[in-house]
Amino acid sequence: MNNLPRNSQFDSSSIINDLPLDLLDEILFRLEPKSMAMMRCTNNSIKSYLSDPRFGPEYPSWVRPSLFNLGSYGATYVCCHPLVSSCDYMSPGNGVELFDGSADCYIFGSCSGLLLLYIGCLFVANPLTKRFRILDHSGSKLIPMIVNGGLKGLSGISYPGGNVACTERAMCVGFAVNRNLTTKRFKIVGILEMENVYGFEINEGDSWRLSETSITTSSKSDLTTRMKPVYLDNTLHWLRNDGSIMSFNPETEQACLIPSIFHREPDTKLLFAESVKINRLTLISGTIETISVYTLVENHKWTLTRRIKNISIEEETLVYWNIAMYDGKCLVVRVKKMGLEPLASVLHVYDMEANSWGVLVSTLAWPNCVRDFYKLTPSLFFVEEDEQQKVLVASNDRRISYINSIMGLIDTTK
């Protein structure tokens, strides 16, 4: 029976305001991402409360991350899989096909729930809130060269090898979202490499500029090709072939060389990553028998912290395998065996706490077999836009439909 007076109105805002903050936090954090996004749009009290910057770094710990999967040399098909420790069945995940050959997709980074990607133009997008921002990339020295071919270094000399060599340098682009600022600013950093000299270009959302910072190293070692940078402690880190690391803080614009050394064995797969559980840089080195986890200790030494028995791989039936993703909680490897469908491979996931392997998903495997994987943990970070600097694109532009399709790939219902 309704005990409210006949003329009274139900005020959900007042009830929300009367809740203890710790209880309200728990209620909101346990909502599905899609439900939280809807509440933000329909309830002013919730919208105001969620504007608190702590919802940026804390909220992702309650929601399921996804794994984007696409070709490294410009993709016309993009896949996305829920990232879980194990599955009872294999599924192809979600995918979107980009039919326009001029709109190949490149993902340059994933950070704090935002994606930096190129589909005919440069986007920063939040797949959870379905908000995106278009950036003018024409002022960059790196990005136009990567997506169009003809990448040049500081010396102005083009890299040999055509478009493949250019797209392999996509790892020179770093994407950083500062979680500690109320404005939640993002920055794009390109590292410019020439011999043992490094420079940096920066975009803060509206324009590109060359940082006054440059660094000259005493040792000559190239950046590791196709090895994505790692953003940790507000600093971007790029791995070099000798195991040392070039670091750059986008806020202070300070750069340094971390003189760590790693002797890579022949025929090993390598992945540079972050362990979110211990907040450390990690190197994953694997053979078909064993996968080893190394942690950077005291900023100068790679120390073996764990060995994992690889999934059963018979060399006679193996077409290829590689390490796709690691975050300290799980490890993902991709395997293509003979006998599978011509365009099929399998992603296997190792639960670091349960010490067990499971099958994550069956996925497409293009003949060149070179794929990029990006973990995205949904968040409510804003994608702010300066109206004066806004890049205008027609609402019926095909690139807009593509970015909307890609943002729609993440599963926010499970």
Swiss-Prot record:
Summary of subunit composition and partner proteins: Interacts with DEK3.
Residues annotated as domain F-box: 13-65
Residue stretches of each Kelch repeat: 281-328, 331-378
Domain of life: Eukaryota
Pfam families given in the database record: F-box (PF00646)
Keyword flag Repeat: yes
Function, as annotated: Probable component of an E3 ubiquitin ligase complex.
SUPFAM superfamilies named in the record: F-box domain
Name listed for the protein in its UniProt record: Putative F-box/kelch-repeat protein At1g20940
Organism of derivation: Arabidopsis thaliana (Mouse-ear cress)
Involved pathway(s): Protein modification; protein ubiquitination
InterPro entries xref list: F-box-like_dom_sf, F-box_dom, SCF_F-box_component
Biological-process GO terms, alphabetical: protein ubiquitination
Keywords: Kelch repeat, Repeat, Ubl conjugation pathway
